[in-house]
Amino acid sequence: MTTTGVPRAEFGVCGGSGTLSFAFPAGLEDDRVEVLAEDLFFDTPFGRSPSFTHFRVTGIHGTRDALAVKMHGWRRGVKRADASLQTFWVFHEAGVRKVLADGGVGSLNHLLDPRDVLVPTDFVDLTMKQDIYVRGDHLLIMRQPMCPDLHGHLFSSASERFARVFRRGSYLVTDGPRFETPAEVDYMKRLGADVIGQSLSPEVFLARDIGACFAGIYMVVNYGEGVVKEWEHKELKAIFFEEAADVARCVVDAIADADLDAGCGCMDMRKPSLLNLPQE
């Protein structure tokens, strides 16, 4: 059923493969979390939205509302770029100020092993999904792509739950859906990236486009081809099912603890556009 009005929410959650196997957020059975509505769909200028869950988190700053979408809003029959636009149009209508994301990634860095966690500070975008926007009326400066406040909360929570957590690193984004060849991995390593995945972009710049902060938490689920050793599907599957709850807890912790008015500087990275392009 399509819902007409988008509920207000301070936080948006782009759930990824890190929490795909988990009933987020209800499955946490966390006293801080109250699910307000599930299976919410909205009509957007980019098509019907994916399903959203509306929930509330009680933390040190009181209550915060959030809208969460599973697997970045991707589904069969919808282009990934359209799914992202639908998702972030809903976030914009809801008044979202902070966006959190999770996902599984492959290691490009020989020091990163499966089940390690990276809270990245930068990214390299090799996708074809860059010329998209919800508003498109601002210059999006990427000097500081990740919100330092959200980043700090994700890192702090992850450090309490996982054995090895890294607070600095670059995420290289590809279109997918296939995995990379050894030659491609070798090339990508030369670009200075530490992990590779398919979901940080366009989310990271669509968040800035709508005036929201962004940070993500990503678990290494496999080695890139030619890195350390060949990965095994059974290990990748085990990670998806065994680690999802703790990744979800990190996201909820960040919602509960983050300061909505932190002096993070993210909005200084967003300036009015100087290009007044004609509309078709």
Which positions does each model-derived feature cover?
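Metabolite-binding pocket within alpha/beta catalytic cores that recognizes anionic/polar moieties
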Residues: M1-M142
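Non-catalytic positions within long, well-ordered alpha-helices that form the structural scaffold/packing
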Residues: H92-G95, K189, R208
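Short acidic/polar active-site loop segments enriched in Thr and Asp
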Residues: R97, D194, C213
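Active-site/ligand-binding-proximal alpha/beta "capping" segment
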Residues: A158-D194, G265-E280
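His/Asp/Glu-rich mid-to-C-terminal helical/loop segments that flank catalytic regions of hydrolases
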Residues: E225-P278
